Amino acid sequence: MTDTNLDFLAMSDPAIAEMIQQELQRQRDHLELIASENFTSAAVLAAQGSVLTNKYAEGLPKKRYYGGCEYIDKVEQLAIDRAKQLFGAAHANVQPHSGAQANFAVFLALLEPGDTIMGMDLSHGGHLTHGSPVNVSGKWFRVVNYGVNRETEQLDYDLIREIALKEQPKLIICGYSAYPRIIQFDKFRAIADEVGAYLLADIAHIAGLVATGHHPSPIPHCHVVTTTTHKTLRGPRGGLILTADAELGKKFDKAVFPGTQGGPLEQVIAGKAVAFGEALKPEFKTYSGQVIANAQALANGLIKRGFKIVSNGTENHLMLVDLRSIGMTGKQADQLVSEVNITANKNTLPFDPESPFVTSGLRLGSPAMTTRGMKEAEFIEIANIIADRLLNPEDEAVKQDVKNRVAALCDRFPLYPHLNIPVAAIA
């Protein structure tokens, strides 16, 4: 959103303008450690606040049901071309409104109600759309779950193979919302081929790492790949479908429109195009490497302070802190760090005895604060800040000290310094 747009908003609707200004200030003043969140560039914000929001464009480039799409076609085609180049895919659909919508379109294209799907148990790091009973994926299909090894807390490919051989799924899903280790897509493909299943990789969390070669790519191994375009990819909130099989790609296109969506959000697609262009630059590869280095610095810093990290570390952008060793729940820890302006989220652990509303874990991620420019030294300081807070929950002096250290870090790495809504216009 440009300064001009903010000026217009402040004059037209001061109530909303004030709320946006308050949210901007919250983002500036907090250490954002939610693993699924990031800060887009000003260019992505501007694209999403553009006149493209005015245009209906059902269909695909050059195959629209509405007139006046000649420039919309150029925008969407550029997004498609950049996505294909970025991920090395033969086909890309940039229209899904979200990662959940992308997954649903894949299900519609490949499955019939009652078919068997196999995905990771939500409590082990899976996702709602991978077969949770409260999601449409768990209501329309027969769901078989796999999890991590109790001892290593990592994927056990031999056990996954045993489950697949027994259950004969039509679709196997890999890719997770809370798994800190490298995914071996080639091993999943061997299992899928053995049972005659399609293989879907949901790389929503690791897309930016995959795009820059910091995580193995699923494109050569999986029939279809879905992702969000925010998180480590640092684009607008949206979804994306990729495949190396152009013929399968046609099925996914039809499953998106008219199968599950109507008009695409072309202003968001423009934001995706901008983000893909940014991700193709050398600076983004440097950023992705720093995301991993920072996550490892944070994990190692917490380990040095006596905390247990699930699987004893991380190879990507996130980690799970097992709080049982300090007698604390995820809910309690979430509240304690929130009180000192740190944003994280409680999270279930593998074999967690607590409910999803309480949990035994805290999920932390490095993408957002890496975007603000922080490096290993700052993430070691963040580890100590978190440790000081959680190990001294009743100490008001420690609480204030920690809050001051958070403020100092945020001040050193400003967020969107060019964005401000005129206070006079709001008042």
Swiss-Prot record:
Annotated InterPro entries: PyrdxlP-dep_Trfase, PyrdxlP-dep_Trfase_major, PyrdxlP-dep_Trfase_small, Ser_HO-MeTrfase, Ser_HO-MeTrfase-like, Ser_HO-MeTrfase_PLP_BS, SHMT-like_dom
Location within or outside the cell: Cytoplasm
The organism's place on the tree of life at top rank: Bacteria
UniProt binding sites for (6S)-5,6,7,8-tetrahydrofolate: 122, 126-128, 355-357
GO biological process, one term: tetrahydrofolate interconversion
Entry cofactors: pyridoxal 5'-phosphate
Primary localisation category: cytoplasm
EC number(s) reported in the record: 2.1.2.1
Annotated site, Plays an important role in substrate specificity, chain positions: 230
The family this protein is said to belong to: Belongs to the SHMT family.
Subunit structure: Homodimer.
Name of the protein this chain belongs to: Serine hydroxymethyltransferase
Lineage: Bacteria, Bacillati, Cyanobacteriota, Cyanophyceae, Oscillatoriophycideae
